Swiss-Prot record:
Residue interval(s) of motif Nuclear localization signal 2 (NLS2): 184-247
EC code(s) of this entry: 3.1.-.-
GO molecular function: endonuclease activity; metal ion binding; RNA binding
Post-translational modifications reported in the UniProt record: Phosphorylated on serines and threonines by host kinases, including human casein kinase II.
Keyword Lyase: no
Organism from which the protein derives: Influenza A virus (strain A/Duck/Czechoslovakia/1956 H4N6)
Similarity section: Belongs to the influenza viruses PA family.
Complexes and interactors: Influenza RNA polymerase is composed of three subunits: PB1, PB2 and PA. Interacts (via C-terminus) with PB1 (via N-terminus).
Cofactor binding mode and count: Binds 2 manganese ions per subunit.
Enzyme class: hydrolase
Keyword NAD: no
Keywords, in A-Z order: Cap snatching, Endonuclease, Eukaryotic host gene expression shutoff by virus, Eukaryotic host transcription shutoff by virus, Host cytoplasm, Host gene expression shutoff by virus, Host nucleus, Host-virus interaction, Hydrolase, Inhibition of host RNA polymerase II by virus, Manganese, Metal-binding, Nuclease, Phosphoprotein
The protein's name in its UniProt record: Polymerase acidic protein
Length: 716
């Protein structure tokens, strides 16, 4: 390759390339592909600027033969190929004389006609991939990007190709020639792959030393060496008679394998009983926000200051009254608790300087709501181990609940788009490896699909509430601290917005173990009338606290504003996971990625761009009684995200059990659909294991009903 480069490019280019590599401590004799790539890039930059001039009238002209009389100025300033110090000097002087914004990275050329810097790219991959890579790296609207490939493709910012057709054809022809010359010498494949960084790993590498000893120690019984075990595993025919295989593995197993046919599975039995109720730590679709746009008040960012500012945007407060009592609670206490919050916020405003945190007075209503002094007294085991009738409390079996329609509505709402963006595009450093570039391209596409999704709002709300509650639990263990429930977003126009959903009052929080519970009372604004679905609000006491004017198509209407109040609890470990809810974005992105990978391996090229930009294609989203639901790729992203977010919001032992056990049945059904003739033993036991998780949890019940829809359609 080195010989080829020295024959193929002129000496000036070779000298510049060697200098550039030396500057980065690289050796042209060793990194020959890099050497070739740098020479090619330099040559393209020079060809791009060759013969292009600006005449006395400031018009761009092409002059191929040197006319010494013409007063011509070069149209392009070449920056590439100069040493870094000199290059920056040129860039700075251009910026000073033209007033153009200074680029963050060194560009390749400056165009005096269009007054812009140009970044030239030469790629052995697809132009759009490399284009996005460049755009992501320089993150500047001002620098123009122009990419050429060795296959004659090109791509430029806003499809503005700067040069005339003929000049560009010269560049493309030269690149094509280089490619053919390389191919004829057998150099092209290695050169093409070196940009991708493709590597193959030897199938079976030798294990030596400590690793070898560990491998030998960790073999199953009856195997003398790793080779011995490997031979056994390799010879283990998977598609033989399963009963024989089982008995070969253990003498105690005697299983009768039953064939699993389309008629074998039955639907899961969902429990009967009163409808299930809302159990999330904060309101979801029913939440109402009091918001301020472009917050710039004193103390902006301090939750209490923000909350007071948001409260002041609402003028419809009225004397609160109970509209839906909590069946088991002392409802007047919930009412008094809200009045106390209002009064204490008023007190803060009357003070000279607003404090950063607010601890509530320990009134009887708050003590009751937070379960103060309710915990049974702990006695040392030594003192009571001789008590004859020592026994654990009898705990009631949970009452079975039936699936209610509200949880499906909650899920549908979580998949919808809001008119605000809840996450910023992460500032992640520039991509170094090609794989990183594909990753950031996928991340950017995915973020664009989910940044406005309501599930993303729930993530940010969950992260905020859990962080604030965990902080307060550690910092103010004995205090009843008032914690505003806040989120931040950006409007369509890009303006910042701070939202207040309501307040939490935290109880005593001496949390020694991960599972020790801190009680809290949540008070959340809403426009939902609880009397429409009273079963959903079983655990809440709901007050009517004001009237809100809403703009509708028919003009302004007044709607009652409600406050949903309940006692709740959480633990250190739950708050820790709540703070990490952003992981849901990652989980759903990985699921989308595996879809892209499947598509790409069929087409043998990266399909990210087509995957997200082909708006006409429909993808399966889920099963409903109507059949397989389909939607755009954006809808798939948002549905996967909502599922992940609900798994976090409604996390429970019932969900863990249901997910693990139902997956086994799912795999058997999939095998049947793929005509793999699955066999099963003790299918009844599997159904039992799944159904013992279907008790009263709304999210688990909804998943079970989806599972039944899937069974129906899968086995048609």
């Amino acid at each position: 390759m080195e010989d080829f480069v020295r024959q193929c490019f002129n000496p000036m280019i070779i000298e510049l390339a060697e200098k550039a590599m030396k500057e980065y401590g690289e050796d042209p004799k060793i990194e020959t592909n890099k050497f070739a790539a740098i020479c090619t890039h330099l040559e393209v930059c020079f060809m791009y600027s060759d013969f292009h001039f600006i005449d006395e009238r400031g018009e761009s002209i092409i002059v191929e033969s040197g006319d010494p009389n013409a007063l011509l100025k070069h149209r392009f300033e070449i920056i590439e190929g100069r040493d870094r110090t000199m290059a920056w000097t040129v860039v700075n002087s251009i910026c000073n004389t033209t007033g153009v914004e200074k680029p963050k990275f060194l560009p390749d050329l400056y165009d005096y006609k269009e007054n812009r810097f140009i970044e030239i790219g030469v790629t052995r991959r697809e132009v759009h991939i490399y284009y996005l890579e460049k755009a992501n790296k320089i993150k500047s609207e001002k620098t123009h990007i122009h990419i050429f490939s060795f296959t004659g493709e090109e791509m430029a910012t806003k499809a503005d190709y700067t040069l005339d057709e003929e000049s560009r054809a010269r560049v493309k022809t030269r690149l094509f020639t280089i490619r053919q010359e390389m191919a004829s010498r057998g150099l092209w494949d290695s050169f093409r792959q070196s940009e991708r960084g493709e590597e193959t790993i030897e199938e079976r590498f030798e294990i030596r030393g400590t690793m070898r000893r560990l491998a030998d120690q960790s073999l199953p019984p009856n195997f003398s060496s790793l080779e011995n075990f490997r031979a056994y595993v390799d010879g283990f025919e998977p598609n033989g008679c399963i009963e024989g295989k089982l008995s070969q593995m253990s003498k105690e197993v005697n299983a009768r394998i039953e064939p699993f046919l389309k008629t074998t599975p039955r639907p899961l039995r969902l429990p009967d009983g009163p409808p299930c109720s809302q159990r999330s730590k904060f309101l979801l679709m029913d939440a109402l926000k009091l918001s301020i746009e472009d917050p710039s008040h004193e103390g902006e960012g301090i939750p209490l200051y923000d909350a007071i500012k948001c409260m002041k945007t609402f003028f419809g407060w009225k004397e609160p009254n109970i509209v839906k009592p909590h069946e088991k609670g002392i409802n007047p206490n919930y009412l008094l608790a809200w009045k106390q919050v209002l009064a204490e916020l008023q007190d803060i405003e009357n003070e000279e300087k607003i404090p950063k945190t607010k601890n509530m007075k320990k009134t009887s209503q708050l003590k009751w709501a937070l379960g103060e002094n309710m915990a049974p007294e702990k006695v040392d085991f030594e003192d009571c181990k001789d008590v004859s009738d020592l026994k654990q409390y009898d705990s009631d079996e949970p009452e079975p609940r039936s699936l209610a329609s509200w949880i499906q509505s909650e899920f549908n709402k979580a998949c919808e788009l809001t008119d605000s963006s809840w996450i910023e595009l992460d500032e992640i450093g520039e991509d170094v490896a090609p794989i990183e570039h594909i990753a950031s391209m996928r991340r950017n596409y995915f973020t664009a699909e989910v940044s406005h999704c309501r599930a993303t709002e729930y993530i940010m709300k969950g992260v905020y509430i859990n962080t604030a509650l965990l902080n307060a639990s550690c910092a103010a263990m004995d205090d009843f601290q008032l914690i505003p429930m806040i989120s931040k977003c950006r409007t369509k126009e890009g303006r910042r917005k701070t939202n207040l959903y309501g307040f939490i009052v935290k109880g005593r929080s001496h949390l020694r173990n991960d599972t020790d519970v801190v009680n809290f009372v949540s008070m959340e604004f809403s426009l939902t009338d609880p009397r429409l679905e009273p079963h959903k609000w079983e655990k809440y006491c709901v007050l009517e606290i004001g009237d809100m004017l809403l703009r509708t198509a028919i003009g302004q209407v007044s709607r009652p504003m409600f406050l949903y109040v309940r006692t709740n609890g959480t633990s250190k470990i739950k708050m820790k996971w709540g703070m990490e809810m952003r992981r849901c974005l990652l989980q759903s992105l990985q699921q989308i990625e595996s879809m892209i990978e499947a598509e790409s391996s069929v087409k043998e090229k990266d399909m990210t761009k087509e995957f997200f930009e082909n708006k006409s294609e429909k993808w399966p989203i889920g099963e409903s009684p109507k059949g397989v639901e389909e939607g755009s790729i954006g809808k798939v992203c948002r549905t996967l995200l909502a599922k992940s977010v609900f798994n976090s919001l409604y996390a429970s032992p019932q969900l863990e059990g249901f997910s693990a056990e139902s997956r086994k049945l799912l795999l058997i059904v999939q095998a049947l659909r793929d005509n793999l003739e699955p066999g099963t033993f003790d299918l009844g036991g599997l159904y039992e294991a799944i159904e013992e998780c279907l008790i009263n949890d709304p999210w688990v019940l909804l998943n079970a009903s989806w599972f039944n829809s899937f069974l129906t359609h899968a086995l048609k």
